[in-house]
Regions:
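Ordered alpha/beta subdomains of enzyme catalytic regions
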Residues: 8, 19-239
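Low-acidity, Ser/Thr- and Arg-rich intrinsically disordered low-complexity segments
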Residues: 2-3, 7-9, 13-17
Length: 239
């Protein structure tokens, strides 16, 4: 059976290429597609950057204040639990545009008529605004700001997508975990969601958010190692 498995070839497709990976010979170059401090600068929607280009070209870089909040609570939900702030702050403190990603952006057709000064600006970019936020684990309600950012228009626009993604997801998971914990009525609730998560990184963030929401442990070993959450597990059903 093992020799049969070793002959299996995995095929991945992208818009520009087809890579055949021979699992036995270890050829090809599969990409892990994980976020890191280098590539998170372009972990955003393109329209955020086209708006930044518009602001820059027109000199629209005055100080502005943006608030992240939930307009309406989901049906049969009376509250949410704020989560994701630590990762949002890490992003703001470490956000930089490296030469590799600036070249990629500069070569995009949508930026062909943009002045080169914009990319000089982005090369020196760092977040210099002010952030006000409720602590993680705080009960929040509709129309109540989770995070308030005061910064230049360009800075605030660049960070919108990442902050929304990070805060929305972890707040969603922490809120659900809190409801389950309350329903358990004093019995311990454990996060076993990694295998059902939308990818390994989502599983890691979910384990963190579950702990904020009141879970007593996680099956995710990486989350336990990185965050100090008690690791819990026995054996699978197949045992």
């Amino acid at each position: 059976a093992s020799s049969v498995m070793m002959r299996i070839k995995a095929v991945t497709r992208s818009l520009h290429s087809k890579i055949t990976i021979d699992m036995k010979k270890n050829t090809g170059k599969p990409e892990p597609l994980f976020l890191n401090d280098a590539n998170m600068c372009i972990s955003t929607d393109l329209y955020q950057l086209t708006m930044v280009a518009g602001y820059f070209e027109r000199g629209m870089d005055h100080k502005s204040t943006f608030e992240l909040f939930v307009r309406n609570l989901p049906e049969r939900r009376s509250y949410l639990i704020a989560a994701g702030l630590e990762q949002a702050i890490h992003y703001l403190k470490n956000l930089r545009f490296t030469a590799e990603y600036l070249k990629y952006l500069k070569d995009l057709p949508v930026f062909k008529n943009v002045s080169r000064e914009l990319f000089d600006y982005l090369r020196e970019f760092y977040f210099s605004g002010d952030v006000y936020a409720v602590p993680e684990g705080t009960v929040i309600f509709a129309n109540e700001p989770i995070i308030r950012v005061t910064a230049s228009m360009i800075e605030a626009q660049i960070i919108e997508t990442y902050l929304l993604s990070m805060i929305n997801y972890q707040t969603l998971i922490a809120s659900k975990a809190s409801r389950v914990v309350h329903a358990a009525d004093g019995r311990g609730v454990i996060d076993f969601g990694t295998r059902r998560a939308h990818g390994p990184h989502a599983g890691l963030l979910a384990a963190r958010a579950c702990f904020i929401g009141g879970c007593v442990g996680t099956s995710n070993v990486l989350a336990a190692y990185e965050l100090g959450i008690p690791p819990i597990g026995t054996v699978a059903h197949s045992w």
